[in-house]
């Protein structure tokens, strides 16, 4: 008898890939998960848990882990790629011989490739040329999903079929999937917020108050949207789950990897010590450098990203950098309502302002 259940493939054995695999299995799909570590493969299949990335949380027994890429991808209707950005291209190329144009390919990776400043869905598009490509992003802490805490996410794609199929595959009583057609904006939001989570962790370690945290998050949102809109994204995307939603959870939760790196740095640990203690990839560290370079090339004002770069890579003390940022010229709150240039022009109207 033929098994009519949809087949889902998940590439990646980390915390989020494992959580997505378990959701799809909860919804009745046949789920195969590809990963490299033989010991972890055996543990998922035998004990139905991932002790390295999601300790103490049960995985749906229907999830079958394997190191055989061809077998995992065989007959899969939906393919979720949950691989760190540094290895994303390599894994996509490894999978390419067994991918088909009819498959729906969805990136869950919140990062940027250094070569060409490419987002993960752009890599999928370039490498495959397939029509059904999407991005899954939002305020999604994997450990909370694994505990079946009520969670919402965004599937972003130009393709209506991709959006609909992902909503059907993952939507359930504890995981709600909203749709967007701004793939670029949703993906940029997921990558950019990691920068500011590091800054939020530093601020917490330095004992800064709630006013400071609120200021940091709202100015981070302004900076994220300024950068993304300059590159072609829709500014309204950033008032949704993939913008302010993801920013809030990543800057507030001690479960956030980037927040934890920032907190360690705020306690005067070196970057190497902070990343080593984490034991997982914190995408924000690499993203800071890439975004800072891109912003300079495109002449986009990014004071928080610039300041964080100085702390991470040039050894400037975090408290000193915060003081320097507070001394910068005051500008517009919401630039899509009142531009920075209009604020600066208005200062010329003040008594005693110099003629220019």
UniProtKB/Swiss-Prot annotation:
Pathway: Membrane lipid metabolism; glycerophospholipid metabolism. It comes from the Bacteria. Its main location: cytoplasm. The active site is at 193 (proton acceptor). PROSITE patterns: NAD_G3PDH. Pfam families: NAD_Gly3P_dh_C, NAD_Gly3P_dh_N. The keyword Cytoplasm applies. NADPH binds at residues 15-16, 36, 110, 142, 257, 281, 283. One of its GO terms (cellular component) is cytosol. InterPro entries: 6-PGluconate_DH-like_C_sf, 6PGD_dom2, G3P_DH_NAD-dep, G3P_DH_NAD-dep_C, G3P_DH_NAD-dep_N, NAD(P)-bd_dom_sf. Sn-glycerol 3-phosphate binds at residues 110, 138, 193, 246, 256-258. It is an enzyme of class 1 (oxidoreductase). Keywords: Cytoplasm, Lipid biosynthesis, Lipid metabolism, NAD, NADP, Nucleotide-binding, Oxidoreductase, Phospholipid biosynthesis, Phospholipid metabolism. GO terms for biological process: carbohydrate metabolic process; glycerol-3-phosphate biosynthetic process; glycerol-3-phosphate catabolic process; glycerophospholipid biosynthetic process. Its EC number is 1.1.1.94. It catalyses: sn-glycerol 3-phosphate + NAD(+) = dihydroxyacetone phosphate + NADH + H(+); sn-glycerol 3-phosphate + NADP(+) = dihydroxyacetone phosphate + NADPH + H(+). It is found in: Cytoplasm. One of its GO terms (molecular function) is NAD binding. Belongs to the NAD-dependent glycerol-3-phosphate dehydrogenase family. PANTHER family: GLYCEROL-3-PHOSPHATE DEHYDROGENASE, GLYCEROL-3-PHOSPHATE DEHYDROGENASE [NAD(+)] 2, CHLOROPLASTIC. Catalyzes the reduction of the glycolytic intermediate dihydroxyacetone phosphate (DHAP) to sn-glycerol 3-phosphate (G3P), the key precursor for phospholipid synthesis. This is Glycerol-3-phosphate dehydrogenase [NAD(P)+].
